[in-house]
Amino acid sequence: MSRDSPPAFDPYKHLNITINPNGSCTRHFVWPRVEPDPDPCPGKLAASKDVTINHETGVSVRIFRPTNLPSNDNAVARLPIIIHLHGSGWILYPANSAANDRCCSQMASELTVIVVSVHYRLPPEHRLPAQYDDALDALLWVKQQVVDSTNGEPWLKDYADFSRCYICGSSNGANIAFQLALRSLDHDLTPLQIDGCVFYQPLFGGKTRTKSELKNFADPVMPVPAVDAMWELSLPVGVDRDHRYCNPLGYLPQKEKVGRLGRCLVIGYGGDTSLDRQQDFVNLLVAAGVRVEARFDDAGFHSIELVDPRRAVALLNMIRDFIS
């Protein structure tokens, strides 16, 4: 390499991680974390509490409810449930990060819903399908709360409408949400009813480069080499990006189940590295006969709602329209 050549791109440096000899990673940036607030002071958007749902794995959920609960005829109105899978870049930050806590608080308050945010385990310490397992544990736990008349979680038993449950995920969380929706079809969730799924900027991949990946190869938020590294650290050891966890389009047994999904909302932006794969995902759903609402905006990029408050409001409005 000549002295004038630019240095090779280091995806691990971009992600601010170091891979350890035992396969774990050191995350050099510690994302600010927020403790739950079950009894918030006046002016806060939502109350929140943490509940461990699997003592063997340590997986927990954080439940959010609006501070001001609506009422009907002097009784508290029942609120829809959103099972929320946060975007973490697979490997970077947990559900109790300040960004996700703020997102879920706003969702609970603005949409008047109960949010159950899943604190799934992170790769590479826990590779896929651990995250899918954790999400299913959370869904089955929510179902159990309504059938357990003695020990059910009070916020769910007292405030939730179990006939209106939605699965919602962002980025890799939308990937988890898709697999959770498919897995839910193998279980009797009665009396819990899944009324729809929201996939926000779903993260999928594959070995063959798409036009949007080539166009946005050096994207400052999601450069393709960094996304490749995320998949490398998240997928089961020994598989490539055409594995069904990353690239669901070619997996025929899964396609039959896709047609049994309820209505879906898919949201994306033109500047997203994953745009083409998101649109292919919409085509997969449509071809299977799923009722799909696709909302793509040419202007925008991955995680734009974190830096543009107007886009955050627009996102909430799209979800509100879908669940109302």
UniProtKB/Swiss-Prot annotation:
Q: What class of enzyme is it?
A: hydrolase
Catalysed reactions listed for this entry: a carboxylic ester + H2O = an alcohol + a carboxylate + H(+)
At the top level, the lineage of the source is Eukaryota
Keyword tags:
Hydrolase, Serine esterase
Q: In which tissues is it expressed?
A: Expressed in flowers.
**EC number of this enzyme:** 3.1.1.1
Reported function: Carboxylesterase acting on esters with varying acyl chain length.
| Membership in a protein family | Belongs to the 'GDXG' lipolytic enzyme family.
- Which PANTHER family does this entry report, sorted A to Z? ARYLACETAMIDE DEACETYLASE, CARBOXYLESTERASE 9-RELATED
Designated name of the protein? Probable carboxylesterase 9
- Protein species of origin: Arabidopsis thaliana
